[in-house]
């Protein structure tokens, strides 16, 4: 029998929250900025955070808000990558922060939690795929990418 998805998410959140350090952010404070090295993950416990992808000095490409119960920067922290977007507290916000080294050590010792992280990353990837599908359906394919690098 499969695990209950809600208990699965609760177990993961509780486990990561137990090894986190609470950080408080005033309204308007950046949690992280696009292009910075990801030093850990953020568990939004209270408040609201604005996420966006800046395009130089031009327009914002994507923007949305997230609230309590959201985990940020998991993929970037696991892959030792840089942040793909920027995050700023919209109101006074509390986030549990788990440094990358702490996270990786914990995952090496707790295989069940490690598998839950893998599942979470997989679900994120599927969600992104479906978002691209919806975007593709919403806009006519007037310019289609070709494998040879051109467009038609």
Q: What name fits each language-model region?
A:
Residues 1-16, 75, 120-124, 138-143:
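Long cytosolic regulatory regions associated with cyclic-nucleotide signaling
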Residues 4, 29-91:
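Cyclic nucleotide-binding regulatory domains
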Residues 6-27, 82:
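Short proline/glycine- and basic residue-enriched helix-capping loop/turn segments at helix->loop/beta transitions
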Residues 26, 61, 101, 127-130:
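Positions in alpha-helical segments
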Residues 108-152:
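Polybasic "coupling" helices that flank or enter modular domains
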């Amino acid at each position: 029998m499969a695990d209950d998805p809600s208990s699965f998410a609760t177990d993961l959140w509780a486990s990561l929250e137990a090894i986190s350090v609470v950080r408080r952010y005033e309204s308007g404070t950046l949690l992280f900025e696009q292009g910075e090295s990801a030093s850990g993950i953020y568990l939004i416990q209270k408040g609201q955070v604005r996420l966006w992808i800046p395009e130089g000095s031009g327009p914002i490409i994507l923007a949305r808000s997230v609230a309590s119960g959201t985990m940020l920067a998991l993929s970037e922290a696991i892959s030792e990558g840089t942040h793909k977007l920027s995050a700023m507290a919209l109101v006074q916000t509390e986030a549990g922060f788990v440094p990358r080294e702490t996270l990786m050590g914990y995952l090496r010792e707790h295989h069940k939690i490690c598998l839950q992280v893998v599942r979470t990353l997989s679900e994120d990837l599927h969600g992104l795929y479906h978002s691209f599908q919806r975007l593709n359906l919403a806009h006519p394919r007037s310019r289609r990418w070709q494998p040879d690098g051109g467009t038609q």
